[in-house]
Amino acid sequence: MQKIELKRVYRHFKGDYYLVEDIARHSETGDEYVVYRKLYGDGSLWIRPLDMFLSKVDKTKYPDCSQEYRFELQNIESVAKY
């Protein structure tokens, strides 16, 4: 199983980029959720169940997808100089 790295950028299999802010736990069920921010548009904050965030792309539904996982960690150099 993959490990989520906080404060790192992930690419969604449909192409957009997101910053993982934290892992949150549901107060009633204890289920874990990934808290992530859109790096486009309004930069809003979103949550998704951890197991869904780490799931593989359904290649039957998306046969042309090049990613193996729904979200994949990106190695992005600093953009501070740009």
What label would you give each PLM region?
Residues M1-Y82:
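Mixed-charge, low-complexity intrinsically disordered regions
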